[in-house]
UniProtKB/Swiss-Prot annotation:
Residues 6-149 form the Nudix hydrolase domain. Its cofactor is a divalent metal cation. A motif (Nudix box) lies at residues 38-59. SUPFAM superfamilies: Nudix (SSF55811). HAMAP family: Nudix_RppH. This is RNA pyrophosphohydrolase. The keyword Hydrolase applies. InterPro entries: Nudix_hydrolase, NUDIX_hydrolase-like_dom_sf, NUDIX_hydrolase_CS, NUDIX_hydrolase_dom, RppH. The gene is rppH.
Length: 176
């Protein structure tokens, strides 16, 4: 489903823990990292798509998370010309995204990257709140900056009230 301007409707998901860190996931078989995201199917609301993508990509369900916020507006990024599939109709030139900030209320062990035969991610870790803005692929950087600015006050208030983590592992491989 591509809109008239060539953008695919999509949801993005920022998952935070009680310390205000965010989940940073490594794309399957690659060296690139990003937040979970995925397309909105016809007839599906952004929230429904978010829960579907949440399970498909990281194995979490409604009971494992709490919605803290969502972006007020759709945020867009254009794909680099080399990534546009010019031979498909309609041509998708980028994504327009509704973002959700979720708090993990379950355990780290509930995260499972192997819920599909074609997983999106093969590893993940908790990182400091602003880390993804500097590390994401360049064409998504402006959207990430805007998302993180919009969600910052909510996440920072969580971090201020949370106990500090004890000896948390820095990186986790896929379960399976």
């Amino acid at each position: 489903m591509i809109d008239d301007d060539g953008y695919r409707p999509n949801v993005g998901i920022v998952i935070c823990n009680r310390q205000g860190q965010v989940m940073w996931a490594r794309r399957y078989g690659q060296h690139s990292w990003q937040f979970p995201q995925g397309g909105i199917n016809p007839g599906e609301s952004a929230e429904q798509a978010m829960y579907r993508e949440l399970f498909e990509e990281v194995g979490l369900s409604r009971k494992d998370v709490r919605i803290l916020a969502s972006t007020r507006n759709w945020l867009r990024y254009k794909l680099p010309k080399r990534l546009v599939r010019w031979d498909t109709k309609p041509v998708c030139i980028g994504q327009k995204q509704k973002w959700f900030l979720l708090q993990l209320i379950g355990n780290d062990a509930d995260i499972n990257m192997q819920t599909s035969s074609t997983p999106e991610f093969d590893g993940w870790r908790w990182v400091s709140y602003w880390y993804p803005v500097r590390q994401v692929v360049s064409f998504k950087r402006d959207v990430y900056r805007r998302v993180m600015k919009e969600f910052a006050s909510v996440t920072m208030s969580l971090a201020e009230s949370a106990p500090k983590p004890q000896n948390a592992p820095a990186y986790r491989r896929k379960r399976g």
